């Protein structure tokens, strides 16, 4: 053994060839600060070996290196800029020394090589991969950019266009694509990986492969003519500006850095990467996006822990076909759980099957599946008008009309047709689960399972625990949601649960602004362009359905009359009374017509102005700051109340539910991350300016206490150790 660290070791293989093996405790390898330091020590040992002829890098895990240790990021990003820059210089010196070894090097890459893992293998001369490879640089999705030389080496290896596509979008690619663009030199079966890598290494040692020529371009300026460079970088900057926008500075910074570094050799190019990385790491956007990643890991880990002792349902059923039922059936079947889809008429069943078939055909058109796979999936969806086969199902989700009487009747009837241990769930969006449970003989086997539309795209499923829902029931439903590829978050029961409970105060803020004379177009523009929502409240209401919102608004008002009961006729009432239900009937705040792709396109409609004039004061202008405050304060206050009342368990789960269920702007990180970034005292000052608008603007006492003591909702993060300590971690 030449060297042994906590996460990697170095040993001789044969005749002057050494292997450097990443083998961290646990299931995966991460390129954390300790591993970077250890890698530097191992390379120091190699540099002393006069008889070294070649080096093989490999992993003892199912994945090569999944990336940097993102749990370190928040503390690392609190280090002063100068110290962070010094540590990056140290880390890059390690990878430079790996690249500069006086012998050929190869990485045998299996599974994931992402972020720092990808940057590590870019420093070797050759890369041989297995078919399960996923390799790329996802840093821009975390609000940063590659910091271990990825923005320098990748463009010089692949050419500017391919590298920009991966780096700016934070993409990873599979084995075939990696081979095609030159990111790896070959792909072999897993059992042949080491044998194949050794064969390449021997050829390089023997002079049959020119490893020095392979290495040279990575250390020189990027080979691009002035015209080629202008075209590549101009197009890339335009595309990034269009897709990422001003709220995500990392992608455009990465492109500009690669452009600026193109004319320099390795050392100066790495300095430019360092100078760009450090300021990004100190942005609120980076902290928010890293926070989302960590919250996502927390939520998924919690679901995994919750379901460790239960079996994933093997057969499911959906009550109520149509678009929602068909979407749920498709998602279950697509992920391998056969499903019975029941309705009371053929027309709805046809609609449900058509929806599932449409989604599968899209996969076929994109080349994701072939005809055989399509037929196989669709054959596991069984439409029926009766309860045939319900005695074999493990779980049933009800997705009928949002009416408590209808839901109770359907659930009670279904309970008599299934086994004693079958779990029942309701896809209600607002009706309290404990109320629906009153119709059942076995309420302990019942809970809520709130999907979001469109089911195949929206990652969140709210799992609602009723008063009598058993732990086993919750675990089984969480297991099914996870199997379906969703992110399940368990919440306690109340009208609207979590997501809709906090959404409708936001809509109430919108209605009050309209009442006071604001223009709905300006509100949408401000909330989209300035705050960052994917769609403004008027457009969102049109997509959700004005009729759906009108009904849900009444349910919420009955559930929380002290805050959500209004004493005036609002814009939603006016549009509902005029049969303007949004996209579903082509008339809402806008008029909708199908575009060339069959998608609804919004157009101005003068008729809506007359309707809104009936429920609004004369038009007046509002500042962007006031619009944002009046929209967001009611929502954030309600989010805080949900935490204080135990409806949602943690700030992390609340923020993920908002991001995954409502599209809360990721660069804000969620309501609690936004609160912490803004500061609770500053938020309180802002909210108090609008408390005259009513109870929705009254800040909960718990948040007032936070403001008094200057306490954040997320645990405070301590800066990482001084840079000198990190080098020897």
UniProtKB/Swiss-Prot annotation:
GO terms for cellular component: fatty acid beta-oxidation multienzyme complex. The keyword Lipid metabolism applies. The active site is at residue 450. Residues 311-729 are annotated as: 3-hydroxyacyl-CoA dehydrogenase. Its EC number is 4.2.1.17, 5.1.2.3, 5.3.3.8, 1.1.1.35. The record marks 119, 139 as: Important for catalytic activity. HAMAP family: FadB. This is Fatty acid oxidation complex subunit alpha. The lineage of its organism: Bacteria, Pseudomonadati, Pseudomonadota, Gammaproteobacteria, Enterobacterales.
């Amino acid at each position: 053994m030449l060297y042994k660290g906590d996460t990697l070791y170095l040993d001789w293989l044969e005749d002057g060839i050494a292997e450097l093996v990443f083998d961290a405790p646990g299931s995966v390898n991460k390129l954390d600060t300790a591993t970077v330091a250890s890698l530097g020590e191992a390379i120091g040992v190699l540099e002393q070996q006069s008889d070294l002829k070649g080096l093989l890098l490999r992993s003892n895990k199912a994945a090569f290196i999944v990336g940097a240790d993102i749990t370190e990021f928040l503390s690392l990003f609190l280090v002063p800029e100068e110290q962070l820059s010094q540590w990056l210089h140290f880390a890059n010196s390690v990878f430079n020394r790996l690249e500069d070894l006086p012998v050929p090097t190869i990485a045998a890459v299996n599974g994931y090589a992402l972020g720092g893992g990808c940057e590590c293998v870019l420093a070797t001369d050759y890369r041989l991969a297995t078919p399960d490879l996923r390799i790329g640089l996802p840093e821009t999705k975390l609000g940063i950019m590659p910091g271990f030389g990825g923005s320098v080496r990748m463009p010089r290896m692949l050419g500017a266009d391919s590298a920009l596509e991966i780096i700016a979008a934070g993409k990873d690619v599979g084995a075939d694509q990696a081979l095609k663009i030159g990111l790896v030199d070959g792909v072999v079966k897993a059992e042949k990986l080491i044998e194949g890598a050794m064969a390449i290494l021997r050829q390089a040692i023997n002079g049959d492969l020119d490893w020095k020529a392979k290495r040279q371009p990575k250390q020189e300026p990027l080979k691009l003519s002035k015209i080629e460079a202008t075209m590549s970088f101009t197009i890339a900057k335009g595309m990034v500006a269009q897709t990422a926008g001003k709220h995500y500075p990392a992608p455009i910074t990465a492109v500009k850095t690669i452009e600026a570094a193109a004319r320099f050799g390795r050392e100066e190019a790495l300095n430019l990467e360092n100078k760009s990385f450090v300021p990004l790491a100190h942005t609120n956007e980076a902290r928010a996006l890293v926070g989302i990643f960590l919250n996502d890991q927390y939520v998924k880990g919690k679901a995994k822990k919750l379901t460790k002792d239960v079996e994933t349902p093997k057969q499911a059923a959906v009550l109520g076909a149509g678009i929602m039922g068909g979407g749920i059936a498709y998602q279950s079947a697509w992920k391998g759980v056969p499903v019975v889809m029941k309705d009371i008429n053929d027309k709805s069943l046809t609609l449900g099957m058509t929806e599932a078939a449409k989604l599968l055909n899209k996969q076929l058109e994109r080349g994701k599946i072939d005809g055989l796979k399509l037929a196989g999936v669709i054959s596991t969806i069984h439409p029926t008008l009766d309860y045939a086969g319900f005695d074999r199902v493990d779980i049933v989700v009800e997705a009928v009309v949002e009416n408590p009487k209808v839901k109770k009747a359907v659930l009670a009837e279904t309970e008599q047709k299934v086994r004693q241990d079958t779990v029942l769930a309701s896809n209600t969006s607002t009706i309290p689960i404990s109320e629906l449970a009153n119709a059942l003989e076995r309420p302990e086997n019942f809970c809520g399972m709130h999907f979001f539309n469109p089911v195949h795209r929206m990652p969140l499923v709210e799992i609602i625990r009723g008063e009598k829902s058993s732990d086993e029931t919750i675990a089984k439903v969480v297991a099914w949601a996870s199997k379906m590829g969703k992110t399940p978050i368990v919440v306690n029961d109340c009208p609207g649960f979590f997501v809709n409970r906090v959404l409708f105060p936001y809509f109430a803020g919108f209605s009050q602004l309209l009442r006071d004379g604001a223009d709905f177009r300006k509100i949408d523009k401000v909330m989209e362009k300035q705050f960052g929502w994917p769609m403004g409240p008027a457009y969102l209401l049109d997509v959700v359905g004005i009729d759906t919102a009108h009904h849900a608004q009444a349910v919420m008002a009955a559930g929380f009359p002290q805050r959500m009961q209004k004493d005036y006729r609002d814009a939603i009432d006016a549009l509902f009374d005029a049969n303007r239900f949004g996209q579903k009937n082509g008339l809402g705040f806008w008029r909708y017509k199908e575009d060339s792709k069959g998608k609804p396109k919004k157009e101005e409609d003068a008729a809506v102005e007359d309707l809104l004039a009936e429920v609004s004061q004369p038009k007046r202008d509002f500042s962007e700051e006031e619009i944002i405050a009046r929209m967001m304060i009611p929502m954030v206050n309600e989010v805080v109340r949900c935490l204080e009342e135990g409806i949602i368990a943690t700030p992390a789960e609340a923020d993920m539910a908002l991001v995954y269920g409502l599209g809360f702007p990721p660069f804000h990180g969620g309501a609690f991350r936004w609160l912490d970034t803004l500061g609770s005292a500053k938020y309180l000052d802002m909210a108090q300016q609008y408390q005259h608008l009513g109870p929705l603007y009254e800040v909960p006492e718990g948040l007032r206490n936070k403001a008094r003591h200057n306490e954040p909702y997320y645990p405070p993060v301590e800066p990482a150790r001084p840079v000198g300590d990190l080098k020897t971690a």
